Amino acid sequence: KGPYTDTWESLSAHTLPKWYHDAKFGIFIHWGVYSVPAFGNEWYSRRMYLKGDACYEHHIQTYGPQKEFGYKDFIPLFKAEKFDAAEWADLFQKAGAKFVMPVAEHHDGFQMYDSDLSEWSKMGPKKDVVGLLGQELAKRDIVLTVSSHRIEHYWFMSGGREFDSDMPEEIPYGDLYWPSVRPPFERPAGENGALPPGIPLGQEAVSGFDVDPEFMEDWLARTCEIVDK
């Protein structure tokens, strides 16, 4: 049992550790399945299902209709065959980084570490990317910090429900696209997008939702797994 309760006020009382203030410079890494299409940005998995978006049109022209080639079909193509954790760590050390933060799971639901909670982490590169990088960083006295964007997965690819795509009407638990709930308002596509009035920054991921307890249990389990591993 920790020092926090399930309120924004309690969570806002959290203070950053001293080492973080002292570190001055760190590197935040976005790398995952979305690097296969390498178009737009790391929101490709959402934008390819939004009619009228540049990624939607690019996807059809490059890979075919979303019904025939969906986001999940990129996973076998994400091999990461040139990934070398030691080489990365050497580069970060030369750059002067004191901490490195890879995204363990982005909004797309693909885990970049060896997870026991999802079959998808056993596909693609079939490597514990975060774990291997963490081992090399430790040898160089660089702090490994990890980011999880799982919470946004609740609604992230819901655009696929609005037309005939590879997303089934009933999405089973554990499926890459689960649960893809339609959001109550359109989320901004990237850090420069504007939020609706009254939605505090940092709370936009779940604002306006009556979030499914099953999803929150799944989110908590994945979060704890990242910490434990």
Regions found by a protein language model. Give the residues of each.
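Mature catalytic domains of secreted/periplasmic carbohydrate-active enzymes
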Residues: K1-K229
